[in-house]
Amino acid sequence: LGETRLCYTADHPAYSSLVCRLYRGDLRLPVEEKMQSLMRLASFAIFGQDRSTRVCGDDGSLCRDTAIEVWRENQRSTEDWHDHSEACEFTTFHAYEYTLADQASNLHRNVIFKSSTVPQAPLSAKDAPTPEQLWGWLDDTCIEGNDSCDVLAIPHNSNWSSGRMWFPYTNQDLSLQEQQRLAALRARLEPLAEMMQVKGDSECRNGIASVIGAPDELCDFEKLRPPSEIIPDCG
């Protein structure tokens, strides 16, 4: 939230930075036209997992402080548009996206709060670069830390996760007891998963290595990668 706001603030020093110019689309990358908008969204990830010092300052505080301002604006808009009357014709939720990208894998979560009781600021993937850190923060800050706060995180766009959305790749060196604790925590915080959105279906995939049985003829619907694309069997 902080980076994007600063990149659109014309009188801020970050406005003319390379990463902000890429993000706004002022510069074009040497990729095909349909990929330009995607590369804009990925511009901050292109420059690494850490916050850009050119945009956020040496300690990242510019982006964190700005994110708090934007988060408050979002909360006001959420409350303004929510129908608090008995008619309940329109419902809004306080929410944000935890936009983690690791090794070119999309590990995004939509973080949705149950009520207007929310943390002071959203936790960025720049400050918590593993899903386990997000779960721990949501549990400590919201669920266990405030009786009036409740939240869930919805994994989305897992069709771009290279399978890492469902593989506990950061837990391999942990004790069995700790792995069980994290699995239970995830089950509590992530009871849902997104199946479909504009960037394709995430429910299933034909052509996965070592799968027993014939391809599912209903599994080629709205795939990000065309069903005709040959997938190498890395089994």
Regions flagged by a language model, labelled:
Residues 1-235:
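Extended, charged catalytic domains and RNA/DNA-binding interfaces, predominantly
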